[in-house]
Amino acid sequence: MLVVEGLTCRFGTKAAVDDASFAVAPGGFVGVIGRSGAGKSTLLRMINRLAEPTAGRILFEGQDVTALRGRELRQWRARSAMIFQQFNLVGRLDVLTNVLMGRLAEMPPWRSLVQAWPERDRALAMSALEQFDMGGVAAQRADSLSGGQQQRVAIARALVQQPDIILADEPIASLDPRNTRIVMDALLRINKHFGITVLCNLHSLDLARTYCDRLIGMSSGRIVFDGAPASLTENIARELYDLEANEVMGAASAPQPAGRMLPALGTAAAA
């Protein structure tokens, strides 16, 4: 279980995250929602330890993540895989090598320098690509792919880390509606098929209500809602987004996963 206790991050006098506390049981798909600047990205980056908390603790299976250093910290970052809005692929390298980068924490430094990837890791990376219909582009340069394809490669890279939890920071922010659906379906598949906990920052409330089984709403660095999507009221939506509720709750329909079933494979390779 992931437990966040009184987590705070200050930049000067401003609190990007202010006294956040919650727990996430294994296997949940949790959407972190709110306006830009609400503290969503900082929260996920603190959980991964890419940003340092000013106060509070992060516990995972009883281990104090905020106290980790050196090798133990690197191991935690492998167990809590990040997926970024910008994809963070190496464009000049082929797709398979980009996915194999997710295995670096398990390799001796000399192997990574000469790219001497073990066959079991290569097989794992190909299997991850095939999960998302990307096996056919394994030899292509990453920068030759569309945005939706690149994000699926980034998700495959996270999957080969064999993480306990995936932290997805606005993974669909730069994608069109079709690729938004494909990427969100990929995250849903990881969650339901592999049982990996997912925390996903989303600006769109409609998407969050469609895909997530729990929502954590943030405003000005503080958690103002924590519950099931059906429990989110119009008043809370106004507080989260500082908008008229009908501008946030259903003005445009989100892409729908088919019947909340696991997304089918074999239909997304060209996206």
Swiss-Prot record:
Keywords: ATP-binding, Cell inner membrane, Cell membrane, Membrane, Nucleotide-binding, Phosphonate transport, Translocase, Transport
Compartments where located: Cell inner membrane
Binding site for ATP: 34-41
GO cellular component entries: plasma membrane
Sequence ranges assigned to domain ABC transporter in this UniProt record: 2-245
Membrane topology term: Peripheral membrane protein
Top enzyme class: translocase
InterPro entries: AAA+_ATPase, ABC_transporter-like_ATP-bd, ABC_transporter-like_CS, ABC_transpr_PhnC, MetN_ABC_transporter-like, P-loop_NTPase
Pfam assignment, any one: ABC_tran
EC number annotated for this UniProt entry: 7.3.2.2
Principal location: membrane
Record-level Gene Ontology MF annotations: ABC-type phosphonate transporter activity; ATP binding; ATP hydrolysis activity
SMART domains cross-referenced by the UniProt entry: AAA (SM00382)
Reaction(s) this enzyme catalyzes, per UniProt: phosphonate(out) + ATP + H2O = phosphonate(in) + ADP + phosphate + H(+)
Domain of life: Bacteria
Recorded family membership: Belongs to the ABC transporter superfamily. Phosphonates importer (TC 3.A.1.9.1) family.
Assembly mode: The complex is composed of two ATP-binding proteins (PhnC), two transmembrane proteins (PhnE) and a solute-binding protein (PhnD).
PANTHER family: AMINO ACID IMPORT ATP-BINDING PROTEIN (PTHR43166), PHOSPHONATES IMPORT ATP-BINDING PROTEIN PHNC (PTHR43166:SF6)
Protein purpose: Part of the ABC transporter complex PhnCDE involved in phosphonates import. Responsible for energy coupling to the transport system.
Entry protein name: Phosphonates import ATP-binding protein PhnC 2
